């Protein structure tokens, strides 16, 4: 009676070990100074400075001088002010900071942000929406996988009972 669940556990676990073996994590301790790693900075090609397609921020190319920890900084050094701003693009850090810094000037930018202002009575409430889509998607994937495993396990149990002759509908 207990053989079928153990068999399902072993077979199901073997199917999950193969994809998990391919996953790897890189810690800062694992990176050897002077050795090229697989980290790619978007917006740079052949050490030429190009504006980033997503955030309109200029990123520097790879430098020859190693830093103390052997890692290159992830903070960009140069930023450009954007005059051709597409409103259908998502909000970026540079565009919201730019709007806050130049709030003293007479011209203001109409920037799409994830902040919504709701006027209730005479009070103005500002709500900040976090990216909850990733969490909902992850929970949906986990629930879907668990349901699929249960469904397939039920089919295997029904087939095993039918083959043993103990199945009576």
From Swiss-Prot:
List of glycosylated residues: 25, 38, 41, 44, 47, 50, 59, 63, 72, 76, 79, 83, 92, 96, 106-108, 113, 126-127
Quote the subcellular location field of this record. Answer: Membrane; Cell projection, Filopodium membrane; Cell projection, Lamellipodium membrane; Cell projection, Microvillus membrane
GO terms of biological process kind = actin-mediated cell contraction; cell adhesion; cell migration; lung development; lymph node development; lymphangiogenesis; lymphatic endothelial cell fate commitment; negative regulation of apoptotic process
| Description of post-translational modifications | Extensively O-glycosylated. Contains sialic acid residues. O-glycosylation is necessary for platelet aggregation activity. Disialylated at Thr-59; sialic acid is critical for platelet-aggregating activity and for CLEC1B interaction. The N-terminus is blocked.
Output the Pfam families linked to this UniProt entry: Podoplanin (PF05808)
Question: What is the membrane topology listed in the Swiss-Prot or TrEMBL record?
Answer: Single-pass type I membrane protein
| GO cellular component assignments | anchoring junction; apical plasma membrane; basolateral plasma membrane; cell projection; cytoplasmic vesicle; cytosol; filopodium; filopodium membrane
Report residue spans for region: Disordered: 37-69
Topology feature Cytoplasmic, residues? 160-169
Q: What is the residue range of the signal peptide feature? A: 1-22
Q: NADP: is it a keyword of this entry?
A: no
Q: Which InterPro entries match?
A: Podoplanin_domain (IPR052684)
Residue ranges annotated as coiled coil are none
Purpose of the protein: Mediates effects on cell migration and adhesion through its different partners. During development plays a role in blood and lymphatic vessels separation by binding CLEC1B, triggering CLEC1B activation in platelets and leading to platelet activation and/or aggregation. Interaction with CD9, on the contrary, attenuates platelet aggregation and pulmonary metastasis induced by PDPN. Mediates effects on cell migration and adhesion through its different partners.
Free-text comment about domains: The cytoplasmic domain controls FRC elongation but is dispensable for contraction. The cytoplasmic domain is essential for recruitment to invadopodia and ECM degradation.
Similarity comment text for this entry: Belongs to the podoplanin family.
Which protein is depicted? Answer: Podoplanin
Q: What is the lineage of its organism?
A: Eukaryota, Metazoa, Chordata, Craniata, Vertebrata
């Amino acid at each position: 009676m207990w053989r079928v669940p153990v068999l399902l556990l072993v077979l199901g676990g073997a199917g999950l070990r193969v994809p998990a073996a391919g996953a790897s994590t890189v810690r800062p301790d694992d990176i050897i100074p002077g050795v090229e790693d697989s980290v790619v900075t978007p917006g740079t090609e052949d050490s030429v400075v190009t504006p980033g397609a997503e955030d309109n921020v200029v990123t520097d190319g790879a430098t020859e001088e190693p830093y103390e920890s052997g890692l290159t900084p992830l903070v960009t050094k140069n930023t450009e002010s954007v005059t051709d701003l597409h409103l259908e693009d998502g909000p970026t850090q540079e565009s919201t900071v730019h709007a806050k810094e130049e709030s003293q000037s007479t011209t203001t930018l109409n920037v799409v942000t994830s902040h919504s202002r709701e006027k209730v009575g005479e009070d103005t409430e500002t709500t900040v929406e976090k990216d909850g889509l990733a969490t909902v998607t992850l929970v949906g994937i986990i629930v879907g996988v668990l349901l699929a495993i249960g469904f397939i396990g039920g089919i295997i149990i029904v087939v095993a009972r039918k083959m043993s002759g103990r199945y009576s509908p």
